[in-house]
């Protein structure tokens, strides 16, 4: 069966309360009166209308919301203020004593910067009457309960005396727009009355038509029920209630001459007329107070019974005495009058009031109340919520107290009184007025939350005030008119609810029939709605064919009207999900004068405004066909806009649709062998162009203690950076390289001499005999011209017996390395000669020698032997001396002095550095030639893997490059694809920056050959030979794919360090050609990505507080637009800007960390970055980022004098977010409540604690939108400034993030996550198992079990989020583990 409401098979659905948007659209076109049932959301339509008007009207205009009662004003203002937290709003009612504001200055001060005023009708009418307010100042007037705009009502006075005359004189542009709100049953009841209201308000009554079906889903009709009771005995007053009888008798016999007012007038000769009037009318203050008190007491007795009357009289007297004793009364009540009243009432007999009774019969209540209690007692509903309407305020208070003590009701019903606040400030009823405003402040909130389940109220709760839907509504007295009948009935909105009216059993059949007739009229009205719906359903059975068809030429993919609806829903389903947002498309239908329909579809606001709203191009008889065609046009538009691919599928990365072009890349893969520069040098020796560099070695940096040698090669030598070599803990050598120079005309013989000198140096410090091959690729020699090499070799090559050296008495300073022939030529360091024996012929020559240092890895300080510690005691013995004595006849001594021989130890290190430099130079000259590096210094760091254990590795640069790449790709996608929503942008970025993509880039460019992974091992090192390199064939090696990806990112970081962003972009472009920011004109694009036609106004103070002046303010509007903001079709949500701002923030934070003077390892930098961009920290800063704003209030300083008091309030950034939704409101308020509770703790931690506040921030658990708008504003600034990071950095500084970063860096604040700390303490033998725990009320909490060494140690329960549970558990685990460690240490000691 077809239906006007699409079924599941249609793959379409309406969003909840979609008719509210329909009414909003209608109100933007003309003045309207929104006529909808009670509880169907009229106030929310008004809020949407206010938001729309604020976005378009000048900032000096005011929106005025009118309501009939003070209570309703208070409620509506609360709703408006909650939904417009950044806008200055205020109420103006009798509570403010507005009627006494007689100066324009007071009104001007109160309304300064106020955009929305909520008041009673009379306040605006009087303000207009006295000229304190003008129609020209108003942008919009909203009339709540608009059916009051009739006859002499203040609402009608506003229109007749001011609106209509202004229209007649100046035209429609001179008056505000009008919106009325009323309950549709009231309007339907009288068409003539409706026409009058429309004329008075210059508006047209509108009821949702296109979504009538949905409206009916949210309105429930209660069952009408009559409660009969026996009327009271007319003679009952004479036989019961002794206290009431005494009060009446005392009142009737009261002598007016005893009245203090009359006595005062008789003593005065000034005003005889006043005395005569008082005696004639019998009206004085005291007599009027007593008269009303007697009347109320009698009414209480008749309505509620004897106990209630006695209770009322007794409580009122006690209340009066208390007020007199505490001087609570106002100064205009004469002391004598107080004493007179107290004296009069004290003479009454005391009533016997028993509060705690077990027998209901002892309460002596009226038959009417007995019937009510019987009705309530019969209610068998655990979810009961009820409302009882009574006539008088006194009845409200007494009935509430009586139900609280009655045995049949006190356990089941949690009663509360509500009478509103009208006239409460100016009331002269000092006697018998038991209800205070303060006592009912929380009544409605308690009722909504379920803390109270029964409210007794006057007719103040009939209309307007938003209370929860009730299951029972009781009229204790018959409704006075149809309006009251309808309004009260509208309060019973729960399913299967009851609407009860109490009747005396002897009431005439006419009255009973009257209400039955009214009920039948209401039933018929609703049946009329249902007939319209049934008619629509019958119409939908018409088979109306929609033949729309679209074909993609390249793939032959086809879109038809029958498939478009499903396609459109799938497109929305894969959009980035957001809390508090329904991502389904919104369908609506408009009707023309021929009753034909055209479909409209609106997509979520993360979709670009150009294709967010689509209309059908034809008019149809059925809604089904209209919506089908609208869906077709919408999806076709998505394809044409580039949001759907040629297969007519979303550009999504969902598994079922993804085609992974990269394939599967293993973690360990085959890559090119590390580039060997000595192969190129080996070939170069066939026709050498010899270059050399002077190598200068200084001991402990002293210039007067230096050694020199020369390094030569067959081609140009790259510049080499100085090195520091660590001999021992007290001795270092600095190796410096002078600028290389070409050496022309070097004969072959000299080259051979250099090879021989290289052997001399290498052999001098080696215990093993070198190979006979001497075709070294790199040559070393003394610091002499090549023509002097032969003489040098003749002098220093080889060795001689030690005995011969001894006989020549060589200077010990010129001694070479001693070699013990008996121990395989073990090298030793000569100390002194030792002779033993009695005569020269029998003496034995020996040498005292030190062992030759075994240490060869001179590059690393950490391999040094530990020397004597500074805190050692002076008598600590020195380590055993390893000096040896060897026989001279078993030793030889090298001719090369040890002072020169030591240079041989440095050759391996020099060659290793030269090799690294040659690899970097080759990379610089080939793959990176267009990047623009100025030197190879940063390249060496970027290509050195940690496994090589070199002095430097790529990890820090990879940390920097990762953020630069993310930033660059984010910018590229954002500016290149202004049509893409955040989901596409995120998936597109992930595809590019993922490790497999970077690994492939490294392989495609040949970068894999230049990644240095080989570890330098000096003990196994051998000088590279020409013969070996000429025979070498390049092979493969096993490399981690992540290492290749890391090196790409590290090179990007190196390029940034070398040449800033320009070099980094060139490097990115080399490996990822599709990323080319230089080809994008960001200044032009910053305007093109802005929403078109945005007219929203932004608070000037916000713009100043951000410290950035937007050229395109619509970007700031977009940055503040939450995905739930569905009422603005011209602005996209902030998600795109938040995507960009996230990358900008990363770039700023990472740059600051990286450029700090203290170099930190990558792991620590990563921890700091994660702590700084933590969503809860950003959310906290968002809540703290506030704008000072002036507010004015009026204080009464005397009877007729008022003073304007100015004060300053802080308006936080989050208040400016544009959104819609009660759930979001509630979540926001809950987050703010947690912020208030945790604020001092978090601020103290950020300013003083040595640890990052992980636990406090996890307990904050702020909703994501708080941090999102920080990042989206950052993105907006970046776009508007044309890609300039400087103003972005200024904003990050302004919110306080940079100052905390500096504190972390300067004071070494511990930022390690507690979970990681616990894992370190437990040596990773610990598990945290977080789990969601549903509760009986439908909510949930989180717990986290901690297992240490496979044993459950404890469980943390009752946390708001899994993160809070895990952080709390980790902190407790740290305490436990530290106790164990300390306990073990104590036992050990």
UniProtKB/Swiss-Prot annotation:
Protein encoded by which gene: dcl2
SMART domains registered for this protein in UniProt: DEXDc, HELICc, RIBOc
Ranges for domain Dicer dsRNA-binding fold: 564-658
Keywords, alphabetical: Antiviral defense, Antiviral protein, ATP-binding, Helicase, Hydrolase, Magnesium, Manganese, Metal-binding, Nucleotide-binding, Repeat, RNA-binding
GO biological process: defense response to virus; regulation of defense response to virus; siRNA processing
SUPFAM superfamilies hit by this protein: P-loop containing nucleoside triphosphate hydrolases, RNase III domain-like
The Helicase ATP-binding domain, residue ranges: 23-203
Pfam families: DEAD, Dicer_dimer, Helicase_C, Ribonuclease_3
Free-text function comment from the UniProt entry: Dicer-like endonuclease involved in cleaving double-stranded RNA in the RNA interference (RNAi) pathway. Produces 21 to 25 bp dsRNAs (siRNAs) which target the selective destruction of homologous RNAs leading to sequence-specific suppression of gene expression, called post-transcriptional gene silencing (PTGS). Part of a broad host defense response against viral infection and transposons.
EC number: 3.1.26.-, 3.6.4.-
Alphabetical list of Gene3D superfamilies matching this protein: Dicer dimerisation domain, P-loop containing nucleotide triphosphate hydrolases, Ribonuclease III domain
Enzyme class, broadest EC rank: hydrolase
Provenance organism: Aspergillus clavatus (strain ATCC 1007 / CBS 513.65 / DSM 816 / NCTC 3887 / NRRL 1 / QM 1276 / 107)
InterPro entries per record: DEAD/DEAH_box_helicase_dom, Dicer_dimer_sf, Dicer_dimerisation_dom, Helicase_ATP-bd, Helicase_C-like, P-loop_NTPase, RNase_III_dom, RNase_III_sf
Family assignment from sequence similarity: Belongs to the helicase family. Dicer subfamily.
Annotated Gene Ontology cellular component terms: cytoplasm; nucleus
RNase III domain boundaries: 920-1060, 1099-1282
Binding locations of Mg(2+): 1138, 1268, 1271
Annotated positions for site Important for activity: 1264
GO function term, MF aspect, one: RNA binding
Cofactor(s) named in the record: Mg(2+); Mn(2+)
Residue positions of motif DEAH box: 144-147
Sites where the protein binds ATP: 36-43
Chain ranges of the Helicase C-terminal domain: 368-537
Name of the molecule in the record: Dicer-like protein 2
């Amino acid at each position: 069966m077809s239906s006007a409401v699409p079924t599941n098979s249609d793959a379409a659905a309406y969003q909840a309360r979609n008719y509210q948007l329909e009414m909003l659209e209608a109100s933007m076109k003309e003045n309207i009166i929104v006529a909808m049932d009670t509880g169907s959301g009229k106030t929310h339509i008004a809020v949407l209308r206010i938001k729309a008007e604020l976005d378009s009207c000048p900032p000096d205009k005011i929106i005025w919301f009118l309501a009939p009662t003070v209570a309703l004003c208070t409620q509506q203002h609360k709703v408006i203020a909650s939904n417009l937290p950044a806008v200055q709003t205020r109420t103006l009612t009798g509570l403010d004593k507005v009627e006494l504001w007689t100066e324009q200055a007071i009104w001007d001060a109160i309304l300064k910067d106020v955009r929305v005023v909520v008041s009673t009708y009379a306040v605006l009418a009087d303000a207009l009457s006295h000229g304190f307010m003008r129609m020209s100042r108003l942008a919009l007037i909203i009339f709540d309960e608009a059916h009051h705009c009739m006859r002499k009502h203040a609402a009608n006075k506003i229109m007749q005396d001011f609106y209509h005359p202004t229209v007649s004189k100046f035209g429609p542009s001179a008056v505000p727009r009008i919106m009325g709100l009323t309950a549709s049953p009231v309007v339907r009841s009288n068409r003539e009355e409706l026409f009058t209201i429309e004329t008075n308000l210059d508006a047209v009554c509108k009821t949702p038509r296109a979504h009538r079906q949905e409206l009916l889903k949210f309105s429930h009709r209660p069952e009408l029920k009559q409660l009969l009771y026996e009327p009271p005995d007319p003679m009952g007053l004479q036989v019961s209630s002794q206290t009431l009888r005494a009060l009446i008798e005392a009142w009737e016999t009261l002598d007016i001459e005893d009245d203090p007012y009359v006595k005062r007038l008789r003593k005065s000769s000034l005003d005889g007329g006043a005395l005569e009037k008082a005696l004639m009318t019998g009206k004085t203050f005291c007599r009027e107070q007593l008269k009303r008190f007697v009347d109320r007491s009698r009414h209480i007795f008749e309505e509620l019974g004897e106990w209630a009357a006695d209770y009322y009289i007794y409580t009122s007297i006690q209340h009066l005495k208390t007020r007199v004793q505490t001087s609570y009364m106002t100064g205009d009540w004469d002391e004598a009058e107080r004493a007179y009243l107290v004296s009069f009432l004290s003479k009454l007999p005391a009533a016997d009031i028993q509060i705690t009774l077990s027998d209901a019969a002892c309460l002596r209540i009226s038959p009417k109340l007995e019937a009510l209690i019987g009705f309530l007692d019969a209610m068998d509903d655990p979810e009961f919520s009820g409302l009882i309407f009574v006539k008088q305020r006194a009845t409200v208070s007494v009935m509430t107290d009586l139900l609280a003590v009655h045995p049949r009701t006190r356990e089941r019903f949690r009663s509360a009184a509500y009478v509103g606040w009208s006239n409460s400030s100016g009331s002269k009823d000092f006697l018998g007025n038991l209800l205070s405003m303060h006592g009912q402040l929380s009544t409605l909130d308690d009722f909504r939350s379920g803390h109270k389940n029964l409210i007794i109220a006057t007719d103040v709760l009939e209309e307007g005030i938003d209370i929860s839907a009730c299951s029972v509504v009781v009229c204790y007295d018959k409704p006075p008119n149809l309006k009251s009948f309808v309004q009260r009935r509208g309060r019973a909105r729960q399913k299967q609810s009851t609407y009860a009216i109490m009747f005396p059993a002897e009431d005439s059949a006419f009255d009973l029939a009257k209400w039955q007739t009214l009920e039948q009229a209401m039933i018929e009205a609703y049946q009329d709605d249902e007939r319209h719906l049934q008619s629509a359903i019958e119409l939908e059975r018409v088979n109306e064919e929609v033949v729309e068809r679209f074909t993609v030429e390249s793939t032959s993919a086809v879109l038809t009207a029958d498939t478009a609806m499903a396609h459109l829903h799938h497109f929305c389903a894969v959009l980035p999900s957001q809390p508090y947002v329904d991502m389904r498309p919104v369908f609506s239908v408009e009707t023309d004068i021929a009753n034909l329909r055209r479909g409209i579809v609106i997509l979520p606001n993360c979709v670009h405004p150009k294709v967010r709203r689509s209309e059908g191009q034809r008019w149809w008889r059925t809604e089904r066909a209209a919506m089908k065609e609208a869906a077709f046009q919408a999806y076709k538009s998505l394809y044409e806009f580039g949001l759907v691919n040629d297969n007519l599928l979303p550009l999504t990365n969902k598994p079922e649709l993804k085609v992974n072009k990269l394939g599967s890349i293993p973690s360990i893969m085959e890559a090119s062998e590390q580039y060997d520069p000595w192969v190129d040098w080996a070939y170069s020796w066939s026709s050498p162009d010899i270059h050399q560099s002077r190598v200068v070695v200084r001991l402990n940096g002293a210039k007067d203690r230096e050694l020199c040698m020369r390094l030569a090669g067959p081609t140009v030598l790259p510049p080499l950076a100085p090195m520091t070599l660590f001999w021992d803990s007290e001795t270092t050598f600095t190796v410096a390289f002078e600028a290389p120079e070409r050496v022309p005309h070097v004969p072959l013989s000299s080259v051979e001499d250099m090879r021989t000198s290289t052997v001399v140096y290498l052999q001098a410090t080696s215990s093993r005999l070198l190979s006979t091959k001497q075709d070294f690729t790199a040559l070393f020699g003394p610091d002499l011209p090549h023509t002097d090499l032969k003489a040098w070799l003749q002098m220093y090559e080889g060795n001689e017996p030690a005995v011969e050296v001894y006989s020549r008495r060589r200077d010990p300073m010129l001694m070479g390395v001693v070699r013990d022939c008996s121990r395989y030529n073990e090298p030793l360091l000569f100390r002194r000669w030792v002779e033993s024996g009695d005569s020269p012929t029998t003496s034995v020559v020996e040498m005292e020698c030190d062992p030759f240092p075994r240490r060869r890895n001179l590059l690393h300080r950490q391999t040094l032997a530990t020397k004597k510690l500074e805190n050692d005691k002076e008598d600590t013995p020195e380590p055993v001396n390893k000096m040896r004595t060897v026989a001279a006849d078993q030793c030889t001594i090298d001719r090369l002095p040890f002072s020169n021989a030591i240079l041989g130890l440095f050759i391996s290190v020099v060659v290793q550095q030269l090799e690294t430099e040659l690899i970097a130079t080759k990379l610089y000259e080939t793959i990176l030639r267009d990047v623009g590096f100025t030197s190879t210094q940063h390249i060496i760091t970027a290509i050195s893997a940690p496994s090589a254990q070199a002095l430097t590795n790529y990890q820090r640069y990879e940390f920097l490059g990762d953020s630069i790449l993310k930033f660059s790709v984010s910018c590229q996608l954002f500016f290149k694809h202004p049509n893409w929503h955040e989901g596409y942008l995120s998936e597109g970025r992930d595809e590019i920056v993922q490790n497999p993509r970077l690994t492939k880039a490294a392989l495609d460019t040949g970068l894999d050959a230049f990644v240095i992974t080989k570890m330098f091992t000096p003990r196994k090192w051998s000088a590279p030979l020409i013969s070996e390199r000429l025979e070498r064939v390049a092979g493969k090696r096993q490399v981690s794919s992540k290492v290749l990806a890391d090196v790409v990112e590290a090179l990007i970081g190196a390029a940034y360090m070398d040449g800033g962003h320009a070099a980094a972009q060139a490097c990115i472009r080399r490996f990822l050609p599709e990323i080319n920011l230089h080809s994008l004109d960001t200044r032009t694009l910053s305007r093109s990505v802005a929403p078109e036609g945005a007219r929203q106004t932004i608070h000037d103070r916000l713009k100043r507080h951000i410290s950035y002046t937007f050229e395109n303010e619509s970007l700031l509007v977009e940055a503040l637009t939450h995905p739930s903001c569905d009422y603005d079709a011209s602005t996209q949500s902030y998600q795109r800007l938040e995507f960009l701002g996230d990358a900008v923030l990363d770039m700023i934070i990472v740059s600051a960390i990286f450029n700090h003077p203290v170099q930190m390892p990558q792991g620590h930098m990563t921890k700091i970055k994660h702590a700084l961009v933590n969503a809860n920290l950003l959310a906290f800063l968002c809540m703290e980022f506030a704008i000072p704003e002036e507010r004015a209030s009026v204080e009464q300083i005397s009877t007729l004098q008022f003073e304007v008091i100015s004060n300053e309030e802080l308006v936080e950034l989050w208040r400016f977010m544009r959104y819609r939704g009660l759930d979001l409101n509630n979540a926001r308020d809950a987050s703010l409540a947690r912020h208030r509770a945790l604020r001092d703790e978090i601020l103290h931690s950020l300013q003083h604690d040595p640890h990052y506040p992980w636990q406090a921030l996890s307990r904050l658990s702020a909703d994501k939108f708080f941090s999102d708008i920080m990042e989206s504003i950052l993105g907006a600034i970046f776009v508007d400034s044309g890609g300039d990071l400087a103003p972005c950095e200024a904003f990050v500084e302004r919110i306080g993030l940079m100052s905390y970063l500096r504190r972390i860096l300067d004071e070494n604040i511990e930022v390690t996550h507690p979970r990681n700390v616990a894992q370190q303490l437990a040596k990773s033998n610990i598990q945290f198992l977080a789990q969601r725990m549903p509760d009986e009320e439908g909510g949930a909490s989180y717990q986290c079990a901690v297992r240490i060494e496979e044993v459950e140690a404890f469980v943390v329960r009752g946390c708001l989020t899994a993160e809070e549970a895990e952080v709390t558990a980790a902190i407790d685990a740290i305490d436990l583990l530290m106790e164990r460690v300390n306990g073990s240490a104590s036992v050990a000691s």
